[in-house]
Amino acid sequence: MIIDCHNHVGADLMFYLHGDFPYAQHLVAMTREGRALGVSKWVVFPFVVPIVFKIEALKRGEIIFDGTGLEKVPYAFENRRLMKEIYEFFPDEGKDCLPFAMLDPMREQAAQIKELRKLRGEYKFYGLKLQTTMIQSFIKTLGNEGRGFVELAAEWDIPFLIHSSVGEQDPWAQASDILDVAEKFPHVRFCLAHSCRYDKECLDRVNALPNTWFDCSAHCIHCDGAVADMPYIAERKRRFDSDYTNPARVIADLAAAYPTKFMWGSDSPFYSYVGMLGEKRLALISTYAKEVAALKANKPEVVDRIANRNIRAWLKLKDESLLADQ
């Protein structure tokens, strides 16, 4: 069995209006493409920027939270829309998906928690997802003003999956800050996305902490970034040592170095990304097929460990039948 632990379903108004890519993914299209490649199950969550922000600003690529957005509570609309798609609109495809709810740790915390409790009473979801870079929300707040979300995760015994960065241009989602939060709450499980941008110090901290994992979402374009020494990748002096011209080799090396903490995820459809990095437009292009091929180039034991067993340990499902072959 191959579980893909990192996928977005829905639409992103800022990406569409600002001319960035990708801006949407349909649940049925994701499962059909993935299943043809050998993927069996998917962890899924909404797209990144909720419709609570000023629409005119989104078109300029700006985040302004002034009460004029289409909704008032971050991700309330997006989370409910995802649950309806999985459980009501497309239950045949939805039965192979484990939905996570998204949240903003910095804005309207009490209102979000109220909405999450209400949603939990109507639908099952299995974790909480944060992407704080695009919404310019400091991940540090999760351990302070936003600790109510951590208390929810502890109460429901569900994990976090958190977008991580290491570049100076991104103060909102620093991997070291996420690890500080995880260290503060040792009884809650955390996954840091994107292999901590190959920052060895952060990967070693993930390995040392009992409650942290990392995923390799958008692996191929991150390998490309390492080869080109792009600023969204850890500097060479801090970088995990591997042959980044060979994404399959990097997976093998990470799996050997961090045998129980490394999880595979594609980041569909964000295995490709076109957008701005500072003053430059990035065009990073990969495919779902390339992500799966880099995984499958490894030994069957490695594939089963990072795309099945480690993910199950992080999810810690009360009902393992959810991951049974249908």
Question: Where do the PLM segments sit?
Answer:
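An N-terminally biased module of ancient metal coordination in phosphate/nucleic-acid-related enzymes
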Residues: 1-77
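Hydrophobic faces of well-ordered beta-strands that scaffold small-molecule active sites
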Residues: 3-7, 42-44, 98-101, 126-130, ...
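Conserved, mostly hydrophobic/aromatic
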Residues: 6, 34, 82, 128, ...
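Active-site environment of divalent metal-dependent phosphoester hydrolases
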Residues: 10-12, 49-52, 106-108, 134-136, ...
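A structural motif corresponding to the C-terminal end of an alpha-helix
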Residues: 33-40, 82-98, 152-157, 185-187, ...
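Glycine-enriched alpha-helix->loop->beta-strand junction motifs that scaffold or abut catalytic
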Residues: 122-127, 148, 155-159, 184-189, ...
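H/E-rich (His + Asp/Glu) clusters that bind or coordinate divalent metals
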Residues: 196-326
